Each structure stands twice: as C-alpha cells, then as structure tokens.
Amino acid sequence: MKFNKYFDHTNLKPDATKDDIRTLCEEAKKYDFASVCVNGIYTAFAKQCLSGSDVKTCVVVGFPLGAMSTDVKAYETKKAVEDGADEIDMVIPVGLLKAGEYDAVYEDIKAVRDACAGKVLKVIFENCLLTDEEKIKACELSVKAGADYVKTSTGFSTGGATISDVALMKAHVEGKCKVKAAGGIRDYNTAAAMIDAGADRLGTSATIKIMEGRQ
C-alpha cells in the first residue's frame, strides 16, 4: 500500500471551524490520503469538500469519552451515514469494559455496526486506561461485533498509540480485522514504526509534517 494511504488526516479540535475543515480536505486531496477524520457537525461539509476525490469522509461517534447510551451512539452513527460518512470511528464504553460488563460493550459496538452497515467501522479502545487483558478482551468483542478496525486511542486522554499496543492488538485480532494507531503520531519515524508494528491505518493531525519528513 502507498504510504499516503495509511493516513486519516484528522482535525477533531472542539474549536475547528469550517475554514479549518476546508483546509484539511484540500490537504487530503493534494496528498490523496485515505480519509479525513472530523466531528459529526462537519460530516456533510467535509463530504462536499472532498467531492470528486477518492478521499473518504471519516466521522467520530461517542467521542471522546464513549460514555453515552448505546441508543445515542446508534442514532449519531445513522445521522453521520445519512450526511455522507464513509467510515465511523466509535469509542467504546471504557468503564463498562473495565467493570467486566462485556455483553454491554459488545451490544454497544454491535448497535453502531448495524447503524453503519456497509461502511467501515473502527472501534476505539483508549488503551492508556486499560490493562493488556482488557485490550485483548476489547479486541475479541470488536471482532465478534463485526468491526473492520480496532483503534488504540482518541488522542484526547492521558496517552496515545504505542508500538507494544499496536503489536498486541495485531496479534489478538488474528487477521479478522485491521489495526488503526492514533494519538501522539507526530513525525515520520513514529509513523513508520507504527506501520512496522502492524498498523494498517494511522490517525494524526500532523500528517503533512510526516509526509514532508519522508521526503
């Protein structure tokens, strides 16, 4: 796969404006990234900005805490798809996972999966808050629910992607889904190391810097 196609060019800042999202989309078209990743309020606008390109519109759901009801996540997903989302990055209910409420976590992921049938679903764990055993369980639940990717982090908590986490997730999805690394990927060497560890997609707001660092 071409290096540029590993990237979800991302702006999830709470103060992002339409001008910021327009710039994000123009950059993504210039470099032909896999997608732009935006908050739901900009789904339709990003889709419009990307018209005529191969760049996908990726939208976050239940972001960044994952701590709202499953019904709300399902509706948010349905609305994003109606507005033009090609890919959904959802956050699991981290507290329920840590409490061992695995059926509830599965149902949460499955509800979003059903709401974006035919679209790409990435499931965000927030690994900095989890033990290795919890990360492994989250992989199992995500695969069972039909996720296309498992994802390390939101980038909004206490830590981001690590090489060891990417390798752990890659091993425990057993080829049944892909791995996205996100959070703290800010230079070419880090991006390359994540890919070497098994990442199939990278989420970062430093994408242009990474591409320039490769040259």
UniProtKB/Swiss-Prot annotation:
Pathway: Carbohydrate degradation; 2-deoxy-D-ribose 1-phosphate degradation; D-glyceraldehyde 3-phosphate and acetaldehyde from 2-deoxy-alpha-D-ribose 1-phosphate: step 2/2. It holds the Pfam family DeoC. InterPro entries: Aldolase_TIM, DeoC, DeoC/FbaB/LacD_aldolase, DeoC_typeI. The keyword Methyltransferase does not apply. The keyword Ribonucleoprotein does not apply. Gene3D superfamilies: Aldolase class I. One of its GO terms (cellular component) is cytoplasm. Its main location: cytoplasm. The active site is at residues 89, 151, 180. It is found in: Cytoplasm. SUPFAM superfamilies: Aldolase. It is an enzyme of class 4 (lyase). Belongs to the DeoC/FbaB aldolase family. DeoC type 1 subfamily. Catalyzes a reversible aldol reaction between acetaldehyde and D-glyceraldehyde 3-phosphate to generate 2-deoxy-D-ribose 5-phosphate. This is Deoxyribose-phosphate aldolase. It comes from Lachnospira eligens (strain ATCC 27750 / DSM 3376 / VPI C15-48 / C15-B4) (Eubacterium eligens).
